[in-house]
Amino acid sequence: MRSSFSKCKVNTCNPSNCLEVDILIVGGGASGIYSAWRLSQTYPNKKVLVIEEKSYLGGRLESVYFGNEKIYAEVGGMRTFPSIDLYVTAVIKKLKLQSIPVPYIEPDNIAYVKNTRLTVEATSIGPSSNPEKQKLIQLYKIPPDEQNISTNDIIYAAAVRAAPTFPEDWRTVYDYPELNNETFSEMFSEQGVSANTQQVFEVFSGYSFFISQRLAASTGIRENISISGENNQHFVVGGYSSIVFGMTDETFCNPNYQLFLNTSIKKITPSNSPNGLHTSILVDTLTGLPITIKSESIILSVPKDSLNRIVAPITPNTIETMNSLTDWRAFKAFLLVDQTTYQLISMNGHMKGRGISDLPARQVWAYSGNPPCVLIYCDNAYADFWKKYINDEINNCFPKFHDPCINKPLVSELKRQIGIIYSVDPSKIVVNKILYKYWYAGAYFSKPSDIPKLFEEVRTPLGPEYSVYLVGSDISVSQGWVDGALNTADNLLVKYYGVTSILDENRLY
């Protein structure tokens, strides 16, 4: 990540002064910077201040260069699906950035489950007489009526029966009240999908939240559209966070738009009069000194845990919405390995994308061949397994690669599990550098609830009478995805600030 921006500098504030701005934006992640960027294009003369609690921008986008000029180590948000993520695609186009397709779910990749080595293709091939499929049927005791159908086809057909309109427009899944108010697993059971096949689906997805986390059915359908591998995944050339840096460079060259890093918000006192100014108390996190900001409106681009720390008259509906979200934990470890190790794990370069297992090392990616890099990725209970190996001092800083000796127990356990999955002697796995991070709340997902109603009401967390707004992927129809963050910000700017949607703008060209 760049330590400074190429065309502008970060401003500092004299805490003895009370600043007055038109718009205060809290949060330097994708939705916060997007909001400032789009406002600067429509209202260059407005005075806008963006604050970010950390010493760097990007929010849950953390891209680290490791020698590959195209693909970075994506410690947070990792990939985009252009046919689904329309807002991300539009931003990439407008910034003149590039994205490239990267292998994801390849049929010959390893699937190590129940102490048995299969290929990922085992869930899709048929008929049941196929040796790979026979193993899968025996391991998971798949019922006869589901044995000759691919797991993805069973899951897709069940979703179509529950939400007939979703193949034409996946956003319509949220129009079905029953899908918002029941779990993904309950929906499958109602549609006749066995618990055995549901288990196969979750295990082979490489994730551990579809069934075990009790997601709302509508949310589960949406997530599977991306995660299923039916659509091509792309990585942003130069790192996913480069979209934030690109928007930043274009925004803060304008002296009316200011950016304060190392600045958190502690309190919001809304104005009692319709045209009055809201008062926000900020704190310089380096000095502890308070800063008072008065603004006509506030855009909060913050996740659930950050919103909960702000002292403000938050409405009961907002509290209800926040309580309806469940946290999603994640763990990633990027290993820079020698060429021999990479050849072993990638099966001499034949394996691309990721293999899966039911071990805590749920996903193992042949991430980069030059330089050789392997990624271990897992979530929720499996991520929690790795938490005991985490050094909090390292985990809480912007990630970087370290000598493996810095955490020998972690490296040893990673090598042990990789060895089991790929039938490789752990002593032959050579790790030269390691980068790792445990995300306590990498995203938030909806539990069964009245999702559309709650998401609409939470847009104005202090009530509709106040010009204080909330954006971010947590309250979007694409939870956990950058596109969700941009979608909420774009909708807000259109509705309350008269900014043209970037999607409509793209249609003009």
Curated annotation (Swiss-Prot):
SUPFAM superfamilies: FAD/NAD(P)-binding domain. InterPro entries: Amino_oxidase (IPR002937), FAD/NAD-bd_sf (IPR036188). It comes from the Viruses. Pfam families: Amino_oxidase (PF01593). GO terms for molecular function: oxidoreductase activity. It is found in: Virion. One of its GO terms (cellular component) is virion component. Keywords: Virion. This is Uncharacterized protein R188. It comes from Acanthamoeba polyphaga mimivirus (APMV).
